[in-house]
């Protein structure tokens, strides 16, 4: 009997050690907005994608839904989350080739250059390239219904593959239709440089926020996580002193500003208190609904964005709220060192970039970045790593590297060894021998970093220009390939 007990103890220890060898959360964050990403995917695309995720040990997928924004993003509302309030249904859609909310002009498939439109098989009556629900919808309600039906199927498919799912949006960013609800004497929002910023102490602002959360819970009842994001552009020029004339928010500011001692100035502390109030609203509302969904805080990783507020939010928020943050500089820089300190108090996830959206016309080798940033997350004792991306084909070596090190914290292959394996598997040993040194050098030195193709702006001929180093290494790659033919 005692031998059997020892056997079970040994087995338990082995299983625990094995679990520690991989991150608890090994995730992906396919980002909606550009047509090169999931905005244009259909259910068959998600099926292939999720199968590939499962094959590579991925156990989490998250989605971010835009609900408006500042400047030209004010009308950028996506239909995975429906914020319907006081019978107002905001306009929303997944973009397609006939919309113009990003840096391209509307174009029907039949007008694509060099008759390339002939390769596309469109649904009956559709003219645009994009998600089938988007290109066949004729009203905002239809856009919402088809998008949410698709994402419910994605949630089901993810769960069938052992993958948990998050749905999220940027708190305090609301569709433009709602700003007309301002009532005299009620401080619903503050005027910023480029948008109106809702006041979380306003009943209207709180109710609109609850409407978004309730829609997630009602539309996706089996959702595993609610992901709340701090807006990329943070606060967009609110006059702090004018805003503090609102007594309810002024009280919250006086009570909590000291938490944000790492913040650079009073404006940053103001954003910290504002974010804290929204996170408290979210946490309490989820509890009141009896939701089992876990709450995640997320945001962008620049110096004036989420990182400067994280320690203050860590001091104030319940420890069962997960913290996440996109790595800085479009992923070129690793996650901050202080995440290790926060990880002693709660679950923390780093978010490396498989690719940056400043170069989505170009090949972006980031095998070394994925290797180094995921290994750093292991050293920091972070609970999870999530990879943001748009495309699937171009960054596939980056993805495989991310998944490899996320699934085995002890992995230690070099960049050259990784490229040799990938190229051997795809093109054979001779090709790998010729091309591994070139791609590994291009990857480590990041010589392509300053080659621009930012899909969030309009196209210019500069997108196709390469400097001498980039021309030279591409010529070497072409010559190496031709020598093998």
Protein language model features and the residues they cover:
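Substrate-binding groove of N-acetylhexosamine-processing glycoside hydrolases
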Residues: 42, 76-79, 196, 218, ...
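Bacterial Sec-dependent N-terminal signal peptides
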Residues: 1-19
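Short acidic/polar active-site loop segments enriched in Thr and Asp
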Residues: 59, 223-224, 383-384
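Feature activates predominantly on carbohydrate-active enzymes
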Residues: 18-204, 221, 349-352, 357, ...
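Alpha-helical scaffolding segments of alpha/beta enzyme cores, especially the outer helices
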Residues: 48-51, 146-156, 160, 207, ...
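Flexible, surface-exposed loop regions and adjacent strand-edge segments
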Residues: 184-186, 244-247
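Structured, solvent-exposed acidic/aromatic patches
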Residues: 241
């Amino acid at each position: 009997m005692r031998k059997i007990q020892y056997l079970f103890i040994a087995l338990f220890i082995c299983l625990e050690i094995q679990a520690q060898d991989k991150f608890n959360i090994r995730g992906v964050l396919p980002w909606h907005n550009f047509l090169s990403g999931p905005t244009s995917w259909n259910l068959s695309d998600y099926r292939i994608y999720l199968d590939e995720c499962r094959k590579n040990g991925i156990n989490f997928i998250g989605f971010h839904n835009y609900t408006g924004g500042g400047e030209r993003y004010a009308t950028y509302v996506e239909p995975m989350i429906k914020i319907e309030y006081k019978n107002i249904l905001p306009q929303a859609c997944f973009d397609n080739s006939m919309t113009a909310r990003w840096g391209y002009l509307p174009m029907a498939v039949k007008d694509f250059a060099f008759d390339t439109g002939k390769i596309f098989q469109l649904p009956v009556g559709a003219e645009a390239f994009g998600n089938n629900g988007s290109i066949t919808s004729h009203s905002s309600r239809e856009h919402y219904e088809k998008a949410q039906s698709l994402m419910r199927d994605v949630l089901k498919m993810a769960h069938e593959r052992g993958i948990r799912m998050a749905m999220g949006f940027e708190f305090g960013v609301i569709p433009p239709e709602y700003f007309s609800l301002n009532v005299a004497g009620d401080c619903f929002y503050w005027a910023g440089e480029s948008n109106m910023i809702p006041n979380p102490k306003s009943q209207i602002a709180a109710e609109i926020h609850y409407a978004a959360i309730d829609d997630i819970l009602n539309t996706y009842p089996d959702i595993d996580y609610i992901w709340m994001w701090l807006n990329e552009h943070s606060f967009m020029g609110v006059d702090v002193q004018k805003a503090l004339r609102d007594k309810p928010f002024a009280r919250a500011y006086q009570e909590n500003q000291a938490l944000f001692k790492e913040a650079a100035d009073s404006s940053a502390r103001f954003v910290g208190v504002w974010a804290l109030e929204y996170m408290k609203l979210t946490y309490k509302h989820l509890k009141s609904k009896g939701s089992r969904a876990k709450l995640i805080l997320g945001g962008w990783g620049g110096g004036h964005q989420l990182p400067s507020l994280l320690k203050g939010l860590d001091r104030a928020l319940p420890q069962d709220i997960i913290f996440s943050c996109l790595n800085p500089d479009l992923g070129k820089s690793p996650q901050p060192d202080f995440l290790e300190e926060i990880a002693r108090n709660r679950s923390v996830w780093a978010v490396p970039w498989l690719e940056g959206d400043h170069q989505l016309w170009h090949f972006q080798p980031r095998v070394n970045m994925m290797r180094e940033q995921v290994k750093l997350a292991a050293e920091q004792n972070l609970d999870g790593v999530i990879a943001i991306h748009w495309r699937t084909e171009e960054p596939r070596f980056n993805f495989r590297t991310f998944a490899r090190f996320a699934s085995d914290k002890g992995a230690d292959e070099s960049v050259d060894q990784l490229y040799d394996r990938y190229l051997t598997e795809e093109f054979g040993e001779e090709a790998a021998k010729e091309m591994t040194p070139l791609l590994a050098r291009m990857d480590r030195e990041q010589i392509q970093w300053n080659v621009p193709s930012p899909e969030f702006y309009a196209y210019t001929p500069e997108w196709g220009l390469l400097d001498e180093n980039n021309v030279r290494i591409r010529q070497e790659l072409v010559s190496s390939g031709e020598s093998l033919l």
